[in-house]
Amino acid sequence: SRIAASDLVPSSLREAAEQAASRQIRHLATLGGNLCQHTRCGYYRLRSFPSLKRGDDTCPVQADGAVQETAGIFENRPCACAHPSSVAPSIGTCDATVHVVGAEGERAVPFAALWAAPEKGRASDTVLAATDVITHVELAARDAAAGWRVAHEEIRQKAAFDWPLVSCAVALRVEGDAVAEASVWLGAVAPTPIRSGAAEAALVGKPFDAKRAASAGEAAVEGATPLAGTRYKLQLVRVAVRRAVAKAWGRS
């Protein structure tokens, strides 16, 4: 709740924090907890089903043709889980550094290096050990005075107390009528939060207009490998990126 109300963090992170969970949960929740939460995949959560992350040989989602809310469309082999953190994309756009203390002492972990690809028997999606604790997260400035414009966008089924089906955060550094620098991160579409270099390339160095935002959305789904039950997320990604880019551009 303090992050959602703080003027010290970018508006995109405030928006993401304000939409997470419920007011009661936000009062008790932490940024580190949101980043390190485990997947919501039903096969992982229910021990009556096999799960690669629990040490079984298969990921049932791969063969399940039903619509999947908690599965991704990128990097979804051998495990198709989607990372549920609602604040991770916004933190990613700020070139964050995660500060950790553990049995080996203190260390700083670049945000992009925090994440670990799924492995058989590995429950965590981060490189942190069981004894590690996130003490704080350091964000690079995204000041409007320096030309930065940021936005967060997510698509979900319910307006409150729900996880996003797809989320996107955007940071644009604007010079004149063009984007000089861009950072586009996606959530809920892969086992870890991912950065979309293709969407960034569609924006940087080009005059901005409504078509440019749509082009970024199209570029964002390049390389996707959706399963039968997650193809719908392709369009959600296109829409979320287009909305986030347009929203960021409209801010000064």
Give each language-model segment a name:
Residues 1-252:
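C-terminal structural segment of proteins
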